Regions:
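Bacterial N-terminal signal peptides
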Residues: 6-15
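Positively charged n-region of N-terminal signal peptides that target proteins for export
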Residues: 1-4
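A sequence-level/structural motif corresponding to short, flexible coil/turn segments enriched
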Residues: 20-408
Length: 408
């Protein structure tokens, strides 16, 4: 009788485990947006009825971006319905080189896009010597424009119907790479990185909605980067990235730590929280509402995708790490979502044993348990969630961007 009771308990436990385990489902893009050069989608944002993407194109022409390439690269923004139908698009470029790296939707429905641009400089003409040899009578052109590095922060304002409303510019000294634009009631805040030879430092800059910029504020100067950020209810900012140098008298714990920075609304660095593991380099690559953070851990012989939910700066509620070939992108809604390229088992998805690295999308509950899991046809480059549309993933196969929607 005792053995029978134990057997029944084991069977019931196995039944509950199987019932609670997530099953990996396959997804397919609603549409695919083809390209021919090194194009990128950098950001996605959602309205109750539309999906808006922004990025950079180097393709000479495009079936889904109006107009032809002006410089070596143009920024772009495009809007689609929740079913993948094209609504509008606009090319953000002129004869200089532009990139578009982040977008945010304002309360009035207009869209702000941050990026960077170069400038075209015309060199001073020089008069060739009178006796210069020119047997073929070649016509000399001394005024071929020269492109500067991407040292200008660019901000574009676009209406909800796809009309360009304003363009603002801040000229810097070195190569500059905006990573995130945040919108408040009165201001725009751009965070990112500044490159000087072999060093990199993070930056903060604010602008009014009429294009008046404050002085730029820098954090670190050797090996500090900001990759993403969110606005907090008190007006402060939580930014995530990596650093291998002293910040606010907080020393690095390894060669490169994942860092979370609390920054005041005026750009003052207030707190620094570092995450590290022995003999690793770490970085946070994204952050969602409610302090859901995603990144990567690099060991000498493997890489892990890291996903952590915090209650406050440096105070984790739950965290998971999975064998991976990429960093983790995260987004928050009623639940927590993460996407990465999986190269190993996933706790909570017992049948998942990939034979080769495979992009996946995972949904987590309040305690970090896996609720649902999905495969993607290509690696994800952008992720967003809202209640009306669901979870939206932009994938990149190397020849086309895919628009994937998972309804909650």
């Amino acid at each position: 009788m005792k053995r029978f009771f134990i057997a029944v308990v084991i069977i019931l436990n196995c039944s509950f485990t199987s019932a609670n385990a997530a099953v990996m489902k396959n997804t397919k893009p609603l549409i695919e947006l083809t390209y021919s050069k090194s194009d990128q989608v950098s950001s996605v944002a959602l309205t109750p009825v539309s999906i808006i993407i922004s990025g950079t194109t180097e393709s000479p022409s495009s079936a889904w971006i109006n107009g032809a390439l002006a410089g070596s690269s143009d920024g772009f923004i495009a809007s689609y319905s929740s079913l993948g139908a094209p609504l509008w698009n606009i090319r953000l470029g002129n004869t200089a080189n532009e990139i578009a790296t982040s977008l945010a939707i304002d309360l009035d429905g207009s869209i702000w896009v941050a990026g960077a641009s170069s400038a075209l400089l015309t060199p001073n003409p020089t008069t060739p010597p009178v006796k210069a040899l020119n047997p073929d009578n070649v016509i000399l052109d001394p005024s071929v424009p020269i492109s500067t590095p991407l040292n200008r922060i660019k901000i574009w304002q676009i209406s909800s119907t796809g009309n360009l409303l304003n363009t603002f510019e801040y000229v810097g000294e070195n190569i500059i790479y905006p990573k995130k634009i945040l919108v408040t009631e009165t201001n725009l805040i751009v965070l990112g990185n500044i490159y000087d030879k072999s060093s990199v430092g993070a930056f903060y800059i604010s602008a009014s909605k009429t294009g008046l910029f404050t002085p730029i504020i820098k954090y670190g100067s050797k090996s500090t980067q900001i990759n993403s950020a969110i606005s907090n209810k008190d007006g402060s900012i939580t930014a995530v990235g990596s650093s291998g140098e002293l910040l606010l008298k907080v020393k690095p714990l390894s060669k490169v730590d994942a860092v979370t920075l609390k920054i005041s609304s005026s750009g003052v660095l207030q707190q620094v929280a570092r995450a590290t593991l022995k003999s690793t380099t770490r970085s946070w690559g994204s952050i969602g509402a409610g302090l859901l953070q995603g990144g990567r851990v690099n060991y000498s012989n493997k890489t892990e995708a890291a996903i952590t939910k915090f209650s406050a700066l440096g105070k984790p509620v739950w965290n998971v790490r999975y064998l991976a070939k990429s960093s983790a992108l995260v987004a928050s809604g009623n639940t927590s979502w993460a996407t990465y390229t999986s190269s190993g088992v996933i706790k909570g998805v017992p049948a998942w044993k990939p034979k080769s690295p495979t992009p996946v999308l995972i949904e987590f509950g309040k305690k970090g348990e896996v609720i649902s899991s999905h495969t993607l046809t290509s690696p994800a480059v952008a992720l967003a969630v809202n209640n009306e549309i669901g979870t939206v993933v932009i994938t990149d196969s190397g020849v086309a961007f895919g628009l994937v929607v998972v309804n909650q």
